[in-house]
Amino acid sequence: DEAADALISAGLRAAFPDLVLITEEQAASHAQRASTFLIVDPLDGTKEFVQRRGDFTVNIAYVEHGVPLRGVVYAPAQDRLFYTLPDGTSVEETGAFDHDIVGTLHPLSVSKPDNTALRVVASKSHRDAATDDYIGKYAVADMKSAGSSLKFCLLATGEADLYPRLGRTMEWDTAAGDAVLRGAGGCMVRFDDHSVLTYGKDGWDNPFFIAYAPGVQLQK
């Protein structure tokens, strides 16, 4: 975590010296407040990494007035790279991931969900009875488990329709994946009142949330 954080932070500070940088690994950064900032999780899915599973990610996001406008989610063990373009749309890049050569870009678009046969993705390491009870309110045709912010990317690629999270997360866990999801036409709302999730909150804690493709009939 710390080695990756040092490398990423140095690069971001050099490229964007005027932007506030919030990173999970630098506790001193958590006291900062700004309407526009960068937010980083250098290793999302620590349990997956320690257990040598492939679904851990690097998350980098740019947030403006509470909205994650740009995001990068990189899953190095899976050779998958997702990010938003300047126009706000999201893509998955494939290829050699060369610094100087952009690979093939595949535009991302969420699914058109069938509420009689939904595809649900949930946390691999933090799934609990409350989550299962909530998922039970839907007609589920397929259930996936995944770690880290890859769950947002599965929604963004159209591989899943719904991702509920009834557990603690921090803004650096979700901002990049949220940006990628929004850029693919998806939504992320609070669990309690279905209002849009915002960023830059005191303490950097997220409420419970639901990420989904428009058309999913959300349950209470």
Q: Predicted regions span which residues?
A:
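Acidic beta-strand-loop-alpha-helix segment within the catalytic core
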Residues: 60-152, 200-220
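Glycine-rich active-site/cofactor-binding loop and its immediate structural neighborhood
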Residues: 34-73
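N-terminal subdomain of lithium-sensitive/metallo-dependent phosphomonoesterases centered on the IMPase/IPPase/PAP
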Residues: 1-43, 129-137, 153, 193-195, ...
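Alpha-to-beta junction loops
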Residues: 157-162, 185-187
